[in-house]
């Protein structure tokens, strides 16, 4: 009788080993680095890293930045539509060595995520961190702290690898500049030839999709006889150019309505719309994005919030499987104490989870672990 015997990995060809490893989730692969020199060499190869990101089954971790801390969350939405209360548990806290305040926690005003990398920025610090591999890259900046900065992280998409870059908006009230930081050369350069025909509000959070960054921007235009001043625009890190203005799936004004942008697993975009003097909230999702152009939208959710109203600055992510969305914002109570509140919303369902202490200025996002090197 014939028996099947397992073959040791050492007798497999390198191509076959690479093909097997390219299908293993990133969080599992990092634990294999020290087990075999051949595997470690493969895992450090930029060509393999790109292949792995394109091939392996993605892991999605819900993250929360609050009170200078970054924590992973366990969000259970099953049963939301059957009147079963959902649950949220703050799990492992991620600490980045060196990026510490006096309390020993991660200090950051904003976090931007792209392909498993987290970009932390405040008035004095720029650091990129891959929590999966533990790698960090501290970036020097000579810009004065008095200038207003806005950052985005993306990559130049080449055939064999991806070259990562940071885009920085600098505005001191009189002068406006764009700068690019290239990871390969560890240097900044000014983008003199790029024209800006919009205003980027301080509260507009950029979102990364397939290496490019998208924002909701302000630019007064007349559409069908009505004044509309909110559009979607993008920055292509390969061409280093802004894309055309794309109309949102609703007519709105940045100055009065609540609008917030999010990414759906870094593959598509979603946008929240809460019209002034209305208790109805809508979330729309892009159907397709080709060459940085959003071609169409679908309405994902429409909910009557009854007495609640969101404010600009709210962050959120959606759960397509459970037809739900999770939001976070700071809310004062009757004693003017600030609480960080998480809202879980489904079709005709609203659940509230109070994280109690604050203020946090919480920022929610979905993180995709990767082997990307910095």
Swiss-Prot record:
Residues 6-52 form the F-box domain. It comes from the Eukaryota. Pfam families: F-box (PF00646), FBA_1 (PF07734). InterPro entries: F-box-assoc_dom_typ1, F-box-assoc_interact_dom, F-box-like_dom_sf, F-box_dom, SCF_F-box_component. PANTHER family: BNACNNG10540D PROTEIN, F-BOX PROTEIN CPR30-LIKE. This is Putative F-box protein At3g17480.
């Amino acid at each position: 009788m014939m028996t099947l015997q397992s073959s040791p990995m050492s007798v497999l060809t390198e191509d076959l080993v690479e093909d097997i490893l390219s299908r293993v989730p990133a969080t599992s692969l990092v634990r294999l680095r020290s087990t075999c020199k051949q595997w470690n060499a493969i895992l450090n190869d930029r060509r393999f890293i790109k292949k792995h990101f394109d091939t392996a089954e993605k892991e999605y971790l819900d993250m929360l930045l609050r009170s200078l801390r970054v924590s992973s969350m366990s969000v259970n939405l099953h049963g939301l539509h059957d009147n079963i209360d959902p649950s949220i548990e703050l799990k492992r806290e991620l600490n980045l060595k060196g990026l510490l305040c006096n309390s020993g926690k991660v200090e950051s005003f904003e976090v931007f995520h792209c392909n498993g990398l987290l970009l932390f920025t405040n008035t004095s610090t720029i650091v990129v961190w891959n929590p999966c591999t533990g790698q960090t890259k501290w970036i020097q900046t000579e810009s004065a702290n008095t200038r207003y900065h806005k950052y985005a992280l993306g990559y130049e998409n080449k055939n064999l690898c991806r070259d990562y870059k940071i885009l920085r908006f600098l505005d001191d009230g009189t002068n406006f500049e764009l700068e690019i930081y290239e990871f390969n050369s560890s240097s900044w350069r000014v983008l003199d030839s790029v024209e800006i025909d919009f205003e980027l509000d301080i509260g507009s959070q950029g979102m990364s999709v397939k290496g490019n960054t998208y924002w909701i921007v302000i630019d007064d235009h007349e559409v069908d006889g009505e004044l509309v001043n909110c559009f979607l625009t993008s920055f292509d890190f390969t061409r280093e150019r802004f894309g055309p203005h794309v109309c949102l799936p609703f007519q709105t004004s940045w100055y009065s309505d609540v609008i917030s942008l999010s990414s759906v697993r870094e593959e598509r975009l979603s946008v929240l719309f809460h019209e002034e003097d209305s208790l109805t909230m809508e979330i729309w999702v892009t159907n397709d994005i080709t060459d940085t152009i959003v071609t169409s939208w679908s309405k994902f959710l429409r909910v009557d919030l009854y007495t609640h109203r969101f404010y600009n600055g709210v962050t959120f992510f959606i759960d397509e499987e459970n037809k739900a969305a999770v939001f976070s914002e700071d809310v004062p109570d009757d004693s003017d104490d600030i609480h960080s509140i998480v809202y879980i919303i489904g079709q005709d369902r609203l659940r509230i989870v109070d994280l109690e202490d604050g203020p946090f200025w919480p920022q929610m996002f979905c993180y995709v672990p990767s082997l990307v090197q910095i």
